[in-house]
Every structure is written in structure tokens, then in C-alpha cells.
Amino acid sequence: MSAREVAVLLLWLSCYGSALWRYSTNSPNYRIFSTRSTIKLEYEGTLFTEWSVPETCFVLNKSSPTTELRCSSPGVHAIKPIVTGPDEEERYLFVESSHTCFLWYYRVRHFFNNFTQLITVWAYDPESADPDELLGNAEEPSINSIVLSTQMATLGQKPVIHTVLKRKVYSSNEKMRRGTWRIVVPMTKDDALKEIRGNQVTFQDCFIADFLILLTFPLLTIPEIPGYLPISSPRGSQLMASWDACVVASAVLVTDMETFHTTDSFKSWTRIRVPPDILSDDERRSVAHVILSRDGIVFLINGVLYIKSFRGFIRLGGIVNLPDGGITGISSRKWCWVNYLLKAKGRRSTFAVWTENEIYLGSILLKFARLVTTTELKNILSLSVTATLTIDRVEYTGHPLEIAVFLNYCTVCNVTKKIFLVIYNEDTKQWVSQDFTLDAPIDSVTMPHFTFSALPGLLLWNKHSIYYCYHNFTFTGILQTPAGHGNLSMLSNDSIIHEVFIDYYGDILVKMENNVIFYSKINTRDAVKLHLWTNYTTRAFIFLSTSGQTYFLYALDDGTIQIQDYPLHLEAQSIAFTTKDKCPYMAFHNNVAHVFYFLDKGEALTVWTQIVYPENTGLYVIVESYGPKILQESHEISFEAAFGYCTKTLTLTFYQNVDYERISDYFETQDKHTGLVLVQFRPSEYSKACPIAQKVFQIAVGCDDKKFIAIKGFSKKGCHHHDFSYVIEKSYLRHQPSKNLRVRYIWGEYGCPLRLDFTEKFQPVVQLFDDNGYVKDVEANFIVWEIHGRDDYSFNNTMAQSGCLHEAQTWKSMIELNKHLPLEEVWGPENYKHCFSYAIGKPGDLNQPYEIINSSNGNHIFWPMGHSGMYVFRVKILDPNYSFCNLTAMFAIETFGLIPSPSVYLVASFLFVLMLLFFTILVLSYFRYMRIYRRYIYEPLHKPQRKRKKN
């Protein structure tokens, strides 16, 4: 070999590992990749000669390592750089012919006085936008964007904000201002995922793409404090990170130089610094694990937990019920479930802490409790007392209420150990041992990551290989490579696994320490090597953006970080084209609009899923559920075949068929038939080329705490808002007290009273509401009672008029049966018995008032005619088959009117007595007069005085 050839070889070897090429567009997250897009090509290395592109594509400067590419025709285009040396990888770019050309841009202002957010929206063209718009830094639209938005508005464009979870819609109520629309939405934490949508309006044959955004309460980064010192991982270690499962834009990254905190996917960030007097220099450089929680950033350093928050930097130990040392690991939730059904009191945990022998669960406000010890686990799992059992890992599963515990078990712990798996449910408090056992070297380190699925599924990896368990541990094995083995290090220059990334679509990225990436999908057995995107020496980490796309974060040598969008699906398509991997079906659809459904008594959920596939392949949809067996299913399948393709549609109805009436253990039966069920749809065959692996959603059977009832026509508006007192006459009270009752009318609780003439009958109309507003009128039976004990009212229907065959339940009879209970608990759905059967109850007096009301029986409340009064009623749904919730509401009625005149007979009697008394007095006075007259007729009343003679 000549000296020149040796020099060339050495040059090539020095460049090997750093020579690569990539591409980008002006559209964020590669959302528009079409014939209209400008594709920027970039070669990183020193051996570049020129670009090789097909004839249908045009390169601005073919001999420049950095240039622009446009492809005028859609399809798959082979692009690669020509270099001096071994050929570089050829990519197959899928260029679309799309009429989606424009994007939405938004800015947000927060108003804490009324907890709203003002979203300013405009349309922009990525091919003609200002640099600030492309970088996401623009505060106002550019001239081109103003013109575009104004033109679109003239054609009828008006964006709205759709919330993904609660399906609410917000629109602009203002006129357009300088090419922008302004939309006000409320701040929320449980409906943060939103989408900007526009009308189907075109300009120059182009539409605006819908845009997914994440809006929560404003999040702040922890500020840097002068004089504080950096905290980092050990020198030379790989990057570690943690993020909020429901707000992926909020994340923390630990490098061997600094720790960075962000709330906007690292578009901006702050460095985390700690006081100089708490940790030594070695401790500050010894971060082993990190967790981002709502209370702050939790660091694990030398077996001790520390937390950095806005309040400072403190050590966590005995003050929060945690060990002061010996902690071996911490973990947090990976998947976001905003809604879930938790029957037990309390909160679910947000992260786990463990030592070799103990597990602690933590929730918000740094509340920790010990969950279990290995000694207790030996008893629970019936393991040998003499065997060695230690806690290997604790990981949250894809289920919102379950935690997986990996246990190391051995009797003679010299060479190998067995790894067992048990799952703990935070709601039922039950431990379930799984059909999972793995033999491993005694000193091996394995890392688990559960998938987003209804049935438990996970990936478990060591330095070189990945072990998969899908479909509740029934589909297992080692992830294979095209080389026929499962050792990923052999295909990545002996590098070891650094990160395993899984998204909600089932994509799996295995990143090696040298940035070689392997790609797989859940429910598949193999992985393929993707094109090199980042050079071997750059320290990188893969994150998920708020739009559901992936991006790389690079830690640079100068102590800063940088982000770069990663076109995962374009890269996967390129490899699939090379390997001729095809999805076995053409389309997989469903109408599951939510990820969380509530089913109450008497309700059913009907959904459908459809698969389109080539003839003679026999595909179908698999429906799987996980959780308590509390739901019944009905299936209906329809099939169509045309033009060589088959369409199979499966319609499912989930329901309950339980009668809760006349059962002795009402509450126990309710509890047995409530719970959380996870359901997933997946095709019977699958490959890495398929877009979505499966559809996962929850069905919660039980009481929706956002459901309530109210009485139609009653509100807290339309009256003077004030509390006042009034007196109830003791004779009007049910329990007959010895004195009158003075009560206070609490307006904030009772609302405005309805004023009725006491000649008017009243039938309450009960309405059902949830957090979205009015749902329907309630047709079920309900009862009412006056909360202060008044019983001077009645009902117009008798038991006989209502169709009773025996004596119905009344407040009087129920109080007699349940004297030990307060009034509001003596009668309810748990002890309700109807009166429409001869087999139940006793005949009794059917002329009594019927005290049960519904919307159709015409039963009304009527009032006493002799006096007015204030009545505060509580209404309760009585039907035991209506709801799992104890639905009650309050309303107040004030009666008024003229006191009615007495009857004619009473008046006549009174007048007769009065006349009789008058004539009696008259006669008596007559006889008295005559007696006096007769006595003095001859004798004057006043005798004259005679004068005496003087002697």
C-alpha cells in the first residue's frame, strides 16, 4: 500500500463515526413534507463530493455539503451524498402531494385575576415565514403572515380551540386584529391538550393544518441563584432525564457538568444550582437518579434523597417518613392518565422510593408512606423464609393505579438470581404475582419500561439486549435484529444501551451510547437499525414533544444544550422501504373519541372498530380487556369485500346487567360491580410499518364525582344574596319539640327560594348535570324531605291512585324502622321497596299520601292553607338502579297568600250565638228594669228632706 493510500485510509478512519447526513424542513416536527417543501440537506464530515438525487428533484448547489432540495413529483426519492471512501447511507424520502401548506402559530398570555388564557392565533406559510416564526420566538405575525391570515379570514376562515379530552370548543368573539384571532380559554389542568382547528377554507389550493398544543396552568422554571454551585452526574456518565408524564414540556436533564430545567421542551431553560454548604464537591457530582415531581426536582445522591424547589434545597429523610440513607432507586409515572377511578380514599402515588428491603410511595406535598417490606412480601408470595429476597426495581405500569415490583430471589446467591415480578394495585391494595421469571447473573443490572397498553406489557434490558413481554406476559422473547441475534451491541460498534424510548403510538427507539438507534414497535419481535442521525461522540437524549413528535437534545461541551427535531416516521419509512417491510392491513379505524369513559347504572357504551386488508389474508380485530370482570359485552361483525380488499367492522357494546333492587347487601354488591377496566383494540397481525399499534381506553364503572342533580328553576341568581333567620312553629315539626325552632337560612347553600302561593301545588323537576353542563331530566323515582324537620305539607296522590297493591314506604314508616339513623339516611336506594307487587309488603291503608315522586306520576307537594312558611327541601334519587352516586340536591320554597275565610256554617253559628247572647242580655236587662220599677213605683228614689221645727 502506497503512502498516499495509507494517508487516505487514516483520514477515513479518523472520520468514521462522525460522517453522516441529515435533512430538515421549515415546518416544525416535519409536519409538512411535500412537493411544496424546501428540504435542507446537511452533510457532516470531510469526505463529501456531491449530492446524488433523482431527476425529479432539484438541488440548489449539488456540490455543497449544505444545500436545499425540492422534489416536484410525489413519491419515494432516493437521496445520498457521494463521498470519497465507503458509500454513505442512502435514504428514501417519502414526499407527499398534499394540499396542506400552511400552519397555525399561537402565543399565550395568562390572566390570573380570572384564571383565563388569551391565545393569539394567526396562519403562516413555513416557506415564506420570518425566522422568528420558524424558531417559535415571534410575538406578532410577519407581514406575509398578516396578509395570509387576512386573506383567509376574507374567505371565511375562523380558528377555534378544541379540547381533546372534554371535547369543548372555544372561538373568538372579537374582530380580527392585525391579522390575528384572539381566543380566550380557561386555565385547566385536566383538559390541557388542545387543538387549533380551522374551517375547510383554501387559499391557492392550500389548507391550514390542525395544530396540537398543550396548555396548562403556567409553569415556572426554578431560577438560578448567584453564588450557588452546579449539581451533576459523575464525570463521563451519560445523560439522564425525567419529565412530567402529563406535561412533557416540563422536564429536567442531568449531565456530567450541569442540571437543566425547562417548561417548554428546552426552547428555554435554567440551570439548577444548590447552596454551597449542604453538599460536598463529590456529592454534587454524584447524582445517580433524578425525578421531576410537582413538588420539585428530586435527586438521589449516595443513597440519600434531596429536593430542589422554589423553597430551597433540602434533604429528605425522617422528616418526611423516608430512610436517611440506603435508598437504591426512585421512579415516577411514565404514562399520563388524567382521569381514572379511585374507589379507595386518598390519592394515588406519583413516585416510588425503595431500598433493598423497603418500598415507599410518595404523593404531592411530599407525603410518603411505607408500602411493604421484603419480609412481608415473603409472606404474601409464600416464599421461603431462609431465601434471600431483595428489591431490584419498582416501576409504574401502563395502568393508572398499578405498580410493578421486580424482586431478586436466590437461595445460594453466588452466580445467578431469579427476577420475579409482582404487581400492586393502589385501589384494591392487592398484590398479584405475574407469570414472569428471568434468570440473570447475580451482578446484572436490568431496566424495565412498561408500554402504553391495556394488558401489562414491558421491555426489560441490560447493556446489550432487550427482553420483551407483551399481552399480559403471554408473548415474550428477546428482540431480534436482522443479523439473527439479539445482541444490539454487535451492530453498534460494541456500544451499550443508553435509553429506551416508547411513545403512545407504540414506537420503540433504542438509543445506544454512541447514538446508534434501533427501531421497533410493540407487539413485534424484531428491531431494525435506523440511519445515523447524530455523530458517535455527541451526548444526546430523546424526548417527546407536546405535539407527540420526537426530538433530540444535545449536551454540548461548553455546558449548554441544544434541541433538534427528529423525523422518526420518515426515518422508519425509509428503512421499511429498504427492508420491504409492509403493513399487513390498509387501514385500522375506530370511533373511540375519548380515552376515558364513565358507565353508570343502566348505561351502555357502544363503539366500533374497522380493519381494511387485502383479500385472502384473514385479518381481524382482537379486543382485550384488563381489570375486574364487571362488564358484559355484545359483539356484532359486518363484512364487505370489493376490488380485492376486505372490510371487517366489529361493533361492541359494553354494559352491566345487575338488578340492585331488593337486595340485602346493596353497598357490598355495588362495590363488587364497580372498578376500572382497560380495553384495547389491536389487529391480529402487525408490523413495524403500521402507523398505530393499538387503541387503548378506560371504562370506569362507578360514580362520576362530576355528576350532580339540581331542581329546574332554582338558582343563586335573581334574588338578594343574604342570610337570615326565621322561626318554625313547634307544632309544624315532625319530632314535636317543646318549643319553637329558630333556624338560619344559608343562602350560599340553599340558593334563592321559590315563592309560591300556598294554593299552588309543586312538582320538582330533577335535572342531571356533569362538568359539561346539562345532561337530561331525571325520570327515576325520588323523595323529598324538609331538612329542619317540618312535616306540615303533604302529597296530592294517594297510594291507591299511584297503583300500589300494598302499603308503600313513607317517611313515618322508614323512621320507625331506622330510629338509630339520622333523617337523611333512613330512606334511600339501599332499602327502597316498591308497592306494585302482591309478593312484597302488607296490604295496609292505601288512602295514605304516596310520598314518592317521579316525572310521570303526577305527584305534587301541596301546602297548608292556614299559614305561610319557609321550606328547605333535600331531594334524593330513590331508584336503586339509577346511579352509583348518592345524588341529592337542595331547594327552598317560600309560601304566601291570604288566610281563607271561615265556612258559612261557622259564621252562621257564630252569629246565632252572638244574637242569642244579645237577646239573653236584653231579656235579663228587661226583667231587671221591671224589678227596679216595681220597687220604686210608689216609693221615690230620693225622699225630700223635711225641715225640723225649732222649739
UniProtKB/Swiss-Prot annotation:
Residues 1-19 form the signal peptide. Its main location: membrane. Residues 20-903 are extracellular. It is found in: Cell projection, Cilium, Flagellum membrane. GO terms for cellular component: CatSper complex; sperm principal piece. The chain crosses the membrane at residues 904-924. Glycans are attached at residues 61, 114, 414, 472, 487, 493, 535, 796, 854, 881, 886. Keywords: Cell membrane, Cell projection, Cilium, Disulfide bond, Flagellum, Glycoprotein, Membrane, Signal, Transmembrane, Transmembrane helix. GO terms for biological process: flagellated sperm motility; sperm capacitation. This is Cation channel sperm-associated auxiliary subunit epsilon.
